[in-house]
Design a protein with these regions (language model features):
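Intrinsically disordered, low-complexity, charge-rich terminal extensions
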Residues: 1-159
Length: 159
């Protein structure tokens, strides 16, 4: 199964959050500029949005977080997060520890999340990755479902 890319935007007039197919071969600046001409501004996934997205997919789609990348390179931090993610596979309660750590990093250390990778174990399952710039890629057969879910969470967090 192949993955399909999407990009999240916000309508400037209605403030609604919407998704559009995205071709990673396209010039990113051109895509954002073209959307702007059509009345949209890009949505950025702040750490608070990313945390809400992770939580939604953990709870609603029986998912596991396979990787979290940060905007800064910190090997010690990466190792600590990797260990928590490993523990989460066997014990979902570690989500609270991870959530607290991610919130703290963002709020007090200005360390933001760059990318999150998730694997859903529900139904046929799917792979999903979400980036700070509002781009996501997901297994093709669940693109609309997951894209709608992402928009709903973004809408809720930024409201």
């Amino acid at each position: 199964m192949r993955n399909v890319y999407g990009k999240v935007f916000q309508n400037i007039l209605t403030r609604d959050v919407e998704y559009f197919l995205y071709d990673p071969q396209q010039n990113y600046y051109y895509v954002v500029q073209n959307a702007s001409k059509n009345g949209y501004q890009q949505s950025i996934f702040t750490s608070s949005v990313m945390i809400a997205l992770i939580e939604e997919f953990l709870l609603k789609y029986n998912s596991i977080v396979t990787e979290i990348e940060f905007l800064v390179e910190d090997e010690e931090l990466n190792q600590e997060i990797k260990e928590i993610l490993e523990k989460m596979k066997d014990n979902g309660a570690y989500w609270e520890i991870l959530k607290e750590k991610l919130s703290f990093l963002s709020k007090y250390d200005s360390i933001d999340i760059k990318k999150v990778s998730i694997k859903s174990r529900q139904g046929m399952g799917f792979l999903l990755s979400m980036q700070v710039n509002g781009i996501f890629d997901v297994t093709e057969n669940v693109y609309d479902l997951v894209a709608t879910e992402i928009c709903n969470v973004v809408r809720r967090v930024i409201a």
